[in-house]
Amino acid sequence: MGQKVHPNGIRLGIVKPWNSTWFANTQDFADNLDGDFKVRKFLNKELANASVSRIIIERPAKSIRVTIHTARPGIVIGKKGEDVEKLRNAVSQIAGVPAQINIAEVKKPELDAKLVADSIASQLERRVMFRRAMKRAVQNAMRLGAKGIKVEVSGRLGGAEIARSEWYREGRVPLHTLRADIDYNTAEAHTTYGVIGVKVWIFKGEILGGMAAVIESEQQPAAQPKKQARKGRK
């Protein structure tokens, strides 16, 4: 029976960057890793309703820098930045070093696998029909420019006695092509019948040039649309 490798894990260092970027010697490595795990667990719990996509952790010179990618930055920042200051103090206490928190906005949440999976899971918890939730997510992603998307849900679908899996795909999702930019993530829907698992694969196109191209695209600011000069009457 064929098994699927984790799409993010197999592409690390090829077209996918790491979520934690720091270097540590043997003595500090375990502490840093444990600190990262605790910080992520805390932030995911605190920001459960803030549409958090990714949490990037860097550790420059005995400090910690956390970048939160979210579709709703206003909720994370709070009124006059109060909430983000509370998060900074809490992260600093967990990690044991001074903390800095940056917020990055996700411009198109419909093309982010984590946010799509969370959206489907929340709909299933609200008793929306699973086929409708899947189809809506697929249509929104394709409308906004995805090259392909696949959604799979598994569990006691519709309250059935026997658990099963169902999936829906549109476009192409090349899992074997290493240069393919495939965003993959999962979520869980806790329903009255039990847990339903949600998996989402989104194919955004091929990346030519490897990690160098990925880093360059992340560093470049989003291009501002040019305002056309209005022609006056002569």
UniProtKB/Swiss-Prot annotation:
Q: Name one GO molecular function term.
A: mRNA binding
Q: Sorted alphabetically, which keywords does the UniProt record give?
A: Ribonucleoprotein, Ribosomal protein, RNA-binding, rRNA-binding
> InterPro entries of this UniProt entry?
KH_dom, KH_dom-like_a/b, KH_dom_type_2, KH_sf_prok-type, Ribosomal_S3_C_sf, Ribosomal_uS3_bac-typ, Ribosomal_uS3_C, Ribosomal_uS3_CS
Q: Name one GO cellular component term.
A: cytosolic small ribosomal subunit
KH type-2 domain sequence ranges: 39-107
Q: Which residues form the signal peptide?
A: none
Q: Which GO terms describe its biological process?
A: translation
Q: How does it assemble?
A: Part of the 30S ribosomal subunit. Forms a tight complex with proteins S10 and S14.
Q: What does this protein do?
A: Binds the lower part of the 30S subunit head. Binds mRNA in the 70S ribosome, positioning it for translation.
Annotated family: Belongs to the universal ribosomal protein uS3 family.
Q: What is this protein called?
A: Small ribosomal subunit protein uS3
Source organism per UniProt: Haemophilus ducreyi (strain 35000HP / ATCC 700724)
